[in-house]
């Protein structure tokens, strides 16, 4: 490394933003092909490219931060601001879905039968699987906080235990959501109710999968002693993201499952 007289990380040119963008294009195009033509070839290529990009980009960032020491306090401050702004953008993303839901449900049009849920729609019981899902995510919020406090106190064993519990609960939530979708008495094509329900809860489910991926990476990094009590922004960002996913679900549960039913 050449000598530098400032605390900032001058990032080397990287191909991963480009391959990541191309993999996103392939995945969205692949989803369209799967939905309309029942062909998963393009989707699988997109997913594979995305997995390879994630692995190699994470590898580079871990090398730069943990082994080369580029993540100085000044760099970490910038990363924190970046993560906060990213979560704010995600809040606005979900605000759009809640807006669509309340726009349709607070003043149902004659086409919907003048009522909500629309005529012919049998909504899911909010006291069955959705309530279990709420309990699972709230429990995972407790366990991720336990993991964070254990890490700050230097308790590696309890940090790994709590993180493993959080990941398990995240995967369990995803499986419950998948079973709920499979058994739902309506589909995404059942008018505005079906589309707002599946798009809002589906994007939340995608965020749970992304958050679980972040936490799995943190788990393997902690197994390799990458985090210390005062240098663990990778884990902190994942924990913030998980709490965001948790809060969004509470709004989804109260709005769409409970009030909307």
From Swiss-Prot:
Reaction catalyzed = 4 Fe(II)-[cytochrome c] + O2 + 8 H(+)(in) = 4 Fe(III)-[cytochrome c] + 2 H2O + 4 H(+)(out)
Keyword terms, alphabetized:
Membrane, Mitochondrion, Mitochondrion inner membrane, Translocase, Transmembrane, Transmembrane helix
Q: In terms of domain of life, where is this protein from?
A: Eukaryota
Give the record's membrane topology.
Multi-pass membrane protein
What InterPro entries does its record include?
Cyt_c/ubiquinol_Oxase_su3, Cyt_c_oxase_su3_dom, Cyt_c_oxidase-like_su3, Cyt_c_oxidase_su3-like_sf, Cyt_c_oxidase_su3_a-hlx
- Annotated Gene Ontology cellular component terms: mitochondrial inner membrane; respiratory chain complex IV
Give GO BP annotations, semicolon-separated.
Answer: mitochondrial electron transport, cytochrome c to oxygen; respiratory chain complex IV assembly
Instruction: Indicate whether Translocase appears among the record's keywords.
Output: yes
Which EC numbers characterise this protein's activity in its record?
7.1.1.9
- Mapped to this chain, the residue ranges on the Mitochondrial matrix side of the membrane are 1-15, 67-72, 153-155, 224-232
Q: Please list the GO terms describing molecular function.
A: cytochrome-c oxidase activity
Q: Which residues lie on this side of the membrane: Mitochondrial intermembrane?
A: 35-40, 106-128, 184-190, 257-261
Q: Where does this one sit in the cell?
A: Mitochondrion inner membrane
Q: Which residues cross the membrane?
A: 16-34, 41-66, 73-105, 129-152, 156-183, 191-223, 233-256
Show the PANTHER family listed in the entry. Answer: CYTOCHROME C OXIDASE SUBUNIT 3, CYTOCHROME C OXIDASE SUBUNIT III
Task: Give the UniProt family note.
Answer: Belongs to the cytochrome c oxidase subunit 3 family.
Please explain the role this protein plays, according to its UniProt record. Answer: Component of the cytochrome c oxidase, the last enzyme in the mitochondrial electron transport chain which drives oxidative phosphorylation. The respiratory chain contains 3 multisubunit complexes succinate dehydrogenase (complex II, CII), ubiquinol-cytochrome c oxidoreductase (cytochrome b-c1 complex, complex III, CIII) and cytochrome c oxidase (complex IV, CIV), that cooperate to transfer electrons derived from NADH and succinate to molecular oxygen, creating an electrochemical gradient over the inner membrane that drives transmembrane transport and the ATP synthase.
**Known partners and oligomeric status:** Component of the cytochrome c oxidase (complex IV, CIV), a multisubunit enzyme composed of 14 subunits. The complex is composed of a catalytic core of 3 subunits MT-CO1, MT-CO2 and MT-CO3, encoded in the mitochondrial DNA, and 11 supernumerary subunits COX4I, COX5A, COX5B, COX6A, COX6B, COX6C, COX7A, COX7B, COX7C, COX8 and NDUFA4, which are encoded in the nuclear genome.
Q: What is this protein called?
A: Cytochrome c oxidase subunit 3
| Organismal lineage | Eukaryota, Metazoa, Chordata, Craniata, Vertebrata
Q: Name the gene.
A: MT-CO3
């Amino acid at each position: 490394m050449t000598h530098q007289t400032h605390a900032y990380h001058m990032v080397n040119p990287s191909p991963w933003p480009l391959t990541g963008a191309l993999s996103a294009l392939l995945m969205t195009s692949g989803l369209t092909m799967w939905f309309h033509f029942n062909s998963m070839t393009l989707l699988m290529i997109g997913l594979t490219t995305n997995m390879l990009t994630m692995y190699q980009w994470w590898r580079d960032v871990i090398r730069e931060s943990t082994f080369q020491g580029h993540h100085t306090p000044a760099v970490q401050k910038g990363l924190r601001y970046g993560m906060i702004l990213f979560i704010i953008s995600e809040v606005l993303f979900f605000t759009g879905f809640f807006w669509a839901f309340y726009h349709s449900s607070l003043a149902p049009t004659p086409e919907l039968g003048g009522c909500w849920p629309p005529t012919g729609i049998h909504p899911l019981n909010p006291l069955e699987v959705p309530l279990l899902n709420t309990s699972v995510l709230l429990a995972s919020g407790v366990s991720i906080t336990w993991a964070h406090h254990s890490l700050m106190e230097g308790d590696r064993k309890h940090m790994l235990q709590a993180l493993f519990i959080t990941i398990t609960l995240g995967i369990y939530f995803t499986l419950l959501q998948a079973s709920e979708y499979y058994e739902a008495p309506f589909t995404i094509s059942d008018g505005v109710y079906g589309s707002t329900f599946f798009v809002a809860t589906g994007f939340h489910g995608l965020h749970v999968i992304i958050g679980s991926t972040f936490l799995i990476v943190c788990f393997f990094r902690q197994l390799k002693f990458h985090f210390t009590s005062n240098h663990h922004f990778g884990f902190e960002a994942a924990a913030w993201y998980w709490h965001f996913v948790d809060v969004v679900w509470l709004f989804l549960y109260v709005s769409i499952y409970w009030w909307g039913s």
